[in-house]
């Protein structure tokens, strides 16, 4: 039996709806930990989505090409500098009052935390499926990613590697007595990990935002308000959205169709 | 043929949906169906509307009356069945049927049972059929509504024809006034799927009201 | 790593004094430069006894200051030396900020925060930069130490050899020779103070005079 209400959009309007859904999703955040070669790493990351071109494909697929993910990362690396431990030997020097010798002074280098801020973007193309559900009294039509595509993070990994190197150098400069050991320290530390390690750290962080990516293109309460209350004698007019379905229908145009019984 | 056609967005509500919307509207705001003067209605409320008595010289306090309507039922083009002549339901039209009960307060001296000095209600119920068409009012993307404008009203089974003409006109005025308060906002036609920029419609075909446009 | 400030002797710094005449120094330790007064000398816990006899004692002796149970402790608490010997006070890693030595020997006051004569302050520089120093007690004494990064081409071994060489600044009165000194990171500068009016060797930025331009702190 046909539905009481039918609302449809073509691919052009579907792109508009998707853009609104991307904006409504806002900024997602995640925290976690991993490793960068031998270095411990913890991070807080955020991501938002925008853009993309929509292709509707029956019966229920929405392909989005070139969806942009803008992400930022606050990476904290734990760097153990104990390999630099050394001692200033006893020095003996003539003074007008006689020779003086200072005691030997040994320095243990600490484990330092290096914070690396980083931001970049990537694009992805993927198929999304339609999922209609009634949850906590609200009807949802969600567009849900069907599989996580491979993300091209090569260029970003190169930039992140450089940013890590710069951050480590800057952090080391503040460690007393590191001065002449700085180049040794930087060389040893940065040799401990490479581009593959950075990619191995960055990839799962960004992919975590893409896995299960869901845009809500429709959300309305089942108890749907047609007209608001107009005091003193006009209560709100409500209807119940008894059933909701969504699909992609193909005729001379492919359209995203929402069907509702009230 | 696509639903959106040369536009980017489409929305429709079928006959059953319109009737459910009218039931919801008049169910929440029954005062649009019940009108009366004292003593039938003493004050405005959500259930009834107070009107003035009909002033007439020599009738103390005027002629008391009440008008009660049942929730109208619509039939969208094409018609589900034949309409009584001369009514014809054409494309982009809908018919509305309702039962109108007209009551007057008959003061004793005019009443049939001979009691003097009391106001006795005297009622008659009439089947009313009207033909109308939808009109859109658009303000901004997603903000607007469809209302109904009557083209013709017929009160069935009234004689002589002159009385029918009087009642047709009376009920047309009353129904037009009632329907002027009835709005089908865009958000029930598209269930708020999008903010519609209206470009075409409303039209009535295939037992549904249809509108087209773009989204913002 | 402590700042360049003879008022607070911390890791990488030393205070030393040559005791020319026999006598006994009664002294106290303080974590703060201003905490010790003449009155506190009466409760002095530590001593250096200077005698005329050598008795096979070495000419340089060392006092290590450590932190124990919230207090500064000198070890050894009592030292016996020969006139002409130098005593070197230094902190170990338990001392969080540094210490001040103040006491009296006869009618003379010995104070690491007010260097007079035959007193020495040493400081190892851990960071590159330009460090202007001055007297926190208000005299015109001042100078500059420029600390450079070692030449990478010279190699790590050459640098380790260089930091075994100290650099001397001879302070006479309120004049320093040399007033400007160039060293590399890790080297120790030794200020030998003679006939001064009770001076300090203090980073000028700590006392609001001019400033130091360390490349990454001090």
Residue ranges and their predicted role:
Chain B
Residues 1-113, 142-216:
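Tubular lipid-binding modules of the TULIP superfamily
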Residues 114-131:
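Amphipathic hydrophobic-ligand
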Residues 85, 128-139:
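Extended lipid/amphipathic-ligand handling interfaces
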């Amino acid at each position: 039996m046909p539905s009481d209400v039918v609302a449809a959009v073509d691919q052009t309007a579907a792109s508009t709806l998707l853009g609104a859904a991307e904006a409504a999703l806002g900024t997602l955040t995640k925290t976690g930990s991993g490793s960068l070669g031998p270095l411990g790493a913890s991070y807080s990351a955020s991501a938002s989505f925008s853009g993309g071109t929509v292709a509707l494909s029956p019966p229920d697929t929405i392909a989005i090409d070139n969806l942009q993910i803008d992400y930022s990362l606050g990476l904290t690396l734990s760097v153990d500098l104990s390999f630099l431990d050394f001692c200033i030997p006893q020095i003996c020097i003539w003074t007008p009052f006689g020779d003086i010798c200072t005691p030997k002074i040994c320095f243990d280098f600490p484990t330092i935390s290096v914070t690396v801020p980083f931001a970049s973007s990537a694009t992805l193309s993927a198929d999304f499926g339609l999922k209609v559900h009634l949850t906590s009294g609200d009807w949802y039509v969600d567009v849900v990613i069907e599989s996580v595509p491979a993300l091209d993070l090569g260029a970003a990994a190169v930039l992140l590697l450089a940013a890590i190197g710069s951050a480590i150098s800057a952090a080391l400069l503040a460690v007393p007595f590191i001065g002449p050991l700085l180049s040794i320290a930087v060389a040893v530390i940065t040799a401990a990990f490479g581009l593959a390690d950075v990619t191995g750290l960055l990839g799962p962080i960004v992919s975590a935002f893409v896995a299960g990516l869901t845009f809500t293109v429709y959300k309305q309460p089942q108890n749907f308000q047609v007209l608001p209350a107009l005091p003193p004698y006009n209560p709100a007019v409500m209807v119940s959205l008894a059933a909701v379905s969504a699909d992609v229908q193909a005729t001379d145009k492919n359209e995203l169709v929402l069907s509702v019984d009230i | 043929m696509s639903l959106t056609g040369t536009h980017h967005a489409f929305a429709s509500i079928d006959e059953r949906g319109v009737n459910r919307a009218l039931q919801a509207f008049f169910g929440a705001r029954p005062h649009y169906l019940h009108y009366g003067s004292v003593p039938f209605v003493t004050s405005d409320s959500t259930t009834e509307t107070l009107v003035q008595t009909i002033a007439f010289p020599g009738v103390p306090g005027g002629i008391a009356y009440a008008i009660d309507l049942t929730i109208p039922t619509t039939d969208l083009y094409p018609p589900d069945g034949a309409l009584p002549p001369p009514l014809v339901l054409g494309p982009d039209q809908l018919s509305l049927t309702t039962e109108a009960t007209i009551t007057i307060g008959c003061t004793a001296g005019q009443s049939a049972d001979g009691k003097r000095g009391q106001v006795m209600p005297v009622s008659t119920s009439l089947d009313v059929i009207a033909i109308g068409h939808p009109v859109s009012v658009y303000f901004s993307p997603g903000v607007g509504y469809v209302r109904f404008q009557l083209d013709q009203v017929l009160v069935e089974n009234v004689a002589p024809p002159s009385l029918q003409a009087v009642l047709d006109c009376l009920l047309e005025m009353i129904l037009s006034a009632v329907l002027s308060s009835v709005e089908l906002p865009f958000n029930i036609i598209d269930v708020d799927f999008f903010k519609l920029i209206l470009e075409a419609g409303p039209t009535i075909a295939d037992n549904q009201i249809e509108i087209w446009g773009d989204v913002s | 790593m402590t700042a360049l400030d003879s008022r607070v002797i911390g890791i990488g710094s030393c205070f030393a004094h040559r005791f020319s005449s026999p006598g006994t120094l009664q002294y106290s330790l303080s974590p703060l430069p201003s905490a010790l007064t003449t009155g506190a000398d009466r409760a002095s816990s530590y001593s250096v006894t200077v005698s005329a006899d050598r008795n096979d004692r070495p000419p340089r002796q060392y006092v290590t200051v450590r932190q124990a149970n919230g207090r500064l402790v000198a070890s050894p608490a009592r030292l016996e030396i020969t006139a002409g010997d130098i005593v070197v006070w230094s902190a170990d890693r338990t001392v969080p900020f540094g210490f001040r030595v103040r006491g009296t020997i006869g009618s003379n006051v010995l104070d690491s925060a007010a260097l007079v004569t035959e007193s020495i302050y040493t400081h190892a520089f851990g960071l590159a930069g330009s460090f202007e120093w001055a007297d926190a007690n208000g005299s015109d004494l001042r100078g500059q130490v420029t600390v450079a990064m070692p030449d990478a081409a010279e190699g790590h071994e050459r640098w380790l050899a260089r930091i075994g060489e100290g650099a001397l600044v001879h302070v006479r009165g309120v004049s320093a020779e040399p007033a400007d000194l160039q060293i590399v990171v890790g080297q120790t500068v030794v200020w030998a103070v003679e006939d001064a009016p009770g001076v300090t060797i203090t980073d000028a930025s700590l006392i609001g005079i001019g400033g130091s331009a360390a490349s990454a702190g001090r």
